[in-house]
Amino acid sequence: VQDYKMNNNVYKFFPQPVFSYQVDNYQNLNKKLKKFILDEFEKDKAGIKRSNINGWHSKPFRFEKGNIALEFAKIIEKYIFNSFQQYGWPFIAEKVKITEMWSIINKKNSFNESHIHPNNYLSSVYYVQAPKNSGNIVFNNPNPVSRNKFPLDIKKTEYSANIQKIQPKE
């Protein structure tokens, strides 16, 4: 195969970032969250059906004074604000709201189907527990044209990949 190396400019129009943060004091936080999630599971083993296949999905959390869901929401505010700043979005901190939060328990052969969270500026995921070999979080290219027709590629690049995976960490 002939190599066609050239000097050129590459303009990365409309990139789709995925921000990754390590939450401060996550080990202690994860212990509290795990207890809260398992308590929620014990109260409602049926859970609700959303994108989960063979896994458990909680009802949306109530942000009540003194519960870990509210504490967690306050802890992650600075990461949300940082993401807004990186996008260059003006915001008033008091007006930024988490619209919904829930937990998922996926065991072996459980997963979540590809889905979106509409009517939000950002979506996020936080892993309380992520054992080795528990699978990846998979992101699909949101550009609809990318799924229509594309040439066979020899090597996946940031320009040609329609799926990207990240190994979750606690």
Q: What spans do the regions from the language model cover?
A:
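Solvent-exposed, well-ordered amphipathic alpha-helical segments
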Residues: 28, 32, 100, 163-165
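Active-site region of the double-stranded beta-helix
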Residues: 67-99, 107-121, 128-133
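Non-heme Fe(II)/2-oxoglutarate
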Residues: 3-92
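Generic secondary-structure boundary/loop-capping signal
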Residues: 15, 53, 58, 95, ...
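Catalytic core of non-heme Fe(II) oxygenases with the double-stranded beta-helix
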Residues: 103-170
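Intrinsic-disorder/low-complexity coil detector
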Residues: 1, 14-16, 59, 143, ...
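Short, charged N-terminal helix-start/capping segments
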Residues: 34-53, 97-122
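A residue-level signal for beta-strand positions that form part of recognition/binding surfaces
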Residues: 18, 100, 136
